[in-house]
Amino acid sequence: MNEYKIKLGEITNGKNSFLFEIKGQFFEAFTLSDVEHAEIIATALLDKDGEKLALTLTIDGKINKLLCDICTEEISVNITAETNVIIKITDEDLTSTDEIIYIKKSENSINLQQLIFELIILNLPKKQQHPLNDRGEVTCNEEMVNLIEKYTVKQEKSSDPRWDALKDLKIK
């Protein structure tokens, strides 16, 4: 997608700022993404010093229509994150790392789509659930939680007899 590319010719020495609006169609390019609906603003601040660019990428917004891990009801999750990357323009064919992105002089733009996607995905909460109320309790759909508990098969924990003897060992 061209809308997440920054033309190198547009970047002047000093600070340059670019704004990107991230919505649902952004995630269509990434087939293995659980995220399909979002309202996020990504800000790319590029500080150019000759052949070197310092990129500060910031995202702020919310991801919609995620499923709560507890009650499976749709929820929205706020997301805010920032990352810093160095972009070096070079003649050599070098492999980029997490901290440094190498761009050949023959290229005329920087595509930030993958970097924005990774920043969003890596900053999703590990456990996606409804927010806590004032008493610190989860505000999940109680009817759904009760149904899940009703139909959940409880399994007894069985131990492996080969390891049972180790339970009696006294370690000093």
Which stretches of residues belong to each language-model region?
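Short beta-strand edge segments in extracellular beta-sheet folds
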Residues: N84-K88
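Charge-rich, low-complexity linker and terminal segments
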Residues: M1-E10, I89-K172
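Short Cys/His-rich "knuckle" micro-motifs
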Residues: N78-A81
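Short cysteine clusters
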Residues: C68-C71, C140
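A positional/architectural concept
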Residues: M1-C68
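Cys/His-rich microdomains that often coordinate metals
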Residues: I75
